[in-house]
């Protein structure tokens, strides 16, 4: 290498090493439900996530095969696609729904406004409850509360439908989570879940490079563990509360474009950098490696986007 390039190359290498070190040292690893609440409180308070993602802190649905789509519209389309897949579009107005892991209420408001459901959204984050309430007009039949999905405060059989999107990775015990979800569904009611899942490592163990990738996907966003699609379906059926079998589907293909689309939003909407200043810019850029790792993991089959539907067994069948 020419001598005049040694200093710039050295500075670039040093900068990359420092950035990588800071990325690893500032990971938001799961410690307890409080660490999850704190992470979402911070994301909600700073407003950056809402600025770029809108009301919906979940992936979008781009069709199968995927087509180019407005980023926010893809998230709205996801809610309708999930409602249709779960059979919720055939239910009457007034149906009671519990939205577990409701974020700032995007899905809850659609289910209330477009389907006429009476929705209760719960999240572990007080700031998300505050923001969801602020965003919900008085005439929309959706309300929000702080609650722990590992120990829901509702009596058995409280809701016609329980709905949950991308909350499962934050749950330390998937069997307990599965039982709590089904416990609060009325007999004959519906549970519909969408989640990030990992490949079933009982069938194909993680290899030498997949293990550190998975470690970062867990540690960076306060996830104790990912279930596999097969494993969580087994968790649901093991409760003894499911009529027949759990229905599953793999929505990796229609949701995959959302990862790179997330990064693209920051490029085509740079005004957000000005609105939130240098601190907001750094916080946004800091998430890019994790988003790219997510795209890699879902793209090569290390992770999958799982869909689950179960009908609660009637009391006479229990």
UniProtKB/Swiss-Prot annotation:
Lineage: Bacteria, Bacillati, Cyanobacteriota, Cyanophyceae, Synechococcales
Record Gene3D superfamilies: Vaccinia Virus protein VP39 (3.40.50.150)
Xref: Pfam families: Methyltransf_11
Classification via InterPro entries: Erg6_SMT_methyltransf, Methyltransf_11, MTs_g-TMT, SAM-dependent_MTases_sf
Region annotated SAM motif I, chain positions: 97-106
Entry protein name: 2-methyl-6-phytyl-1,4-hydroquinone methyltransferase
Stretch list, region SAM motif III: 184-193
GO molecular function: 2-methyl-6-geranylgeranyl-1,4-benzoquinol methyltransferase activity; 2-methyl-6-phytyl-1,4-benzoquinone methyltransferase activity; 2-methyl-6-solanyl-1,4-benzoquinone methyltransferase activity; methyltransferase activity
E.C. no: 2.1.1.295
Functional note: Involved in a key methylation step in both tocopherol (vitamin E) and plastoquinone synthesis. Catalyzes the conversion of 2-methyl-6-phytyl-1,4-hydroquinol (MPBQ) to 2,3-dimethyl-6-phytyl-1,4-hydroquinol (DMPQ, a substrate for tocopherol cyclase), and 2-methyl-6-solanyl-1,4-benzoquinol (MSBQ) to plastoquinol.
Catalytic activity: 2-methyl-6-phytyl-1,4-benzene-1,4-diol + S-adenosyl-L-methionine = 2,3-dimethyl-6-phytylbenzene-1,4-diol + S-adenosyl-L-homocysteine + H(+); 2-methyl-6-(all-trans-nonaprenyl)benzene-1,4-diol + S-adenosyl-L-methionine = plastoquinol-9 + S-adenosyl-L-homocysteine + H(+); 6-geranylgeranyl-2-methylbenzene-1,4-diol + S-adenosyl-L-methionine = 6-geranylgeranyl-2,3-dimethylbenzene-1,4-diol + S-adenosyl-L-homocysteine + H(+)
Taxonomic source organism: Synechocystis sp. (strain ATCC 27184 / PCC 6803 / Kazusa)
Segment forming the signal sequence: 1-39
EC supergroup of this enzyme: transferase
Family to which this protein belongs: Belongs to the class I-like SAM-binding methyltransferase superfamily. gTMT family.
Annotated region (SAM motif II), positions in chain: 157-165
GO terms, biological process: methylation; vitamin E biosynthetic process
Record pathway: Cofactor biosynthesis; tocopherol biosynthesis
Domain of life the protein comes from: Bacteria
Entry keyword set: Methyltransferase, S-adenosyl-L-methionine, Signal, Transferase
